[in-house]
Amino acid sequence: MPYHPQPSQIKAYLVHGDYRPASTFVCSDVDLNAIHDMVNYTLRCLTFSGYMVDCPHLERAGYGGDGNSSTQAFQTMYDAAPTYMNWLQAWGDVMQEDGGLPHVAPAGGGGGGPYWCGFIVLAPWRTYVNYGDSRLLERYYDNMKKWFGY
């Protein structure tokens, strides 16, 4: 840039998925309210691409371990069932013929362990528990069995 912009000349935009809130939280403890607001902001920042990413500025990879760690919070705070329908489709697509799974979907690759690949099992189950929606369990049950067999 040929000049140093002033703060009043700079605009920033939060790019995120259009999620309908599923719950609210307010309490008398300002610190807990602040923590809740930070978690809310973080989840919005990490779910702008149809699946949850590990960070919005580096890899932007859909690690299963990150998904497993945050599914409960994300699904409690938002109606995120469409995101999980999309993301589980990606996990089904990257499954290998022998039942093996990478640690990341949709791109594949990454590093981790069973907790990362286990997203194919835990995400459909948690979606059922949190929303009463059994479609992911029905759709990916064979994938789950295949992965367990691997």
Name every feature range the model reports, one short phrase each:
Residues 78-150:
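Helix-terminus loop motifs that line ligand-binding clefts
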Residues 9-15, 38-48, 90-100:
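Active-site-adjacent bridging/hinge elements
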Residues 57-78:
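Extended ligand-binding clefts on enzyme/binding-domain cores
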Residues 1-34:
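Extended acidic/polar, glycine-enriched regions
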Residues 24-27, 31, 62, 76-80, ...:
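Catalytic cores of large soluble enzymes that bind and process phosphate-bearing ligands
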